[in-house]
Amino acid sequence: DYAEEIQVVKEIPYGEIEGFPVSTVPGHAGKFIFGYLDEIPVVCMKGRVHYYEGYPITDVVLPTRLMKLLGAQILFLTNAAGGVNTSFHAGDLMLIKDHISVFAPNPLIGQNIEELGVRFPDMSSVYDEELQELIKKTAKEQHIFLQEGIYAQLTGPSFESPAEIRM
């Protein structure tokens, strides 16, 4: 568990933040963890809300926007996902090289907040190449098998249909 590596300074349960969305998914602790990793200040979300829980997209992206406004410069995401690539196996780790957004609605819909970014962001370089190289190098040094692939973002909570698998 990545959060276990953090030297914790403060934990704030989402339920203690007025108006903040709280996950209904079992296993999602639902709290921010503020602290340090190797003397680097970090904020970690232990659990999150999902669009399929019935939250509006503005609530789903609220935590990410909040972290940006708090000064976060790098967003490192992890999740469990189904896969359609037959060369992948359950439990494989995958570095996302690009994505296909089959997600509706787009999380950028709504009022644009200039402090968070431009109205129409360039999506050609969403995934930082230097950070990806560092992740690949570290995985190799640690003897961690790391797949690379394209992430297809769907709303859930259903598994992929046969047509989606063939895409």
Q: What do these predicted regions represent?
A:
Residues K137-M167:
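Active-site/ligand-binding-proximal alpha/beta "capping" segment
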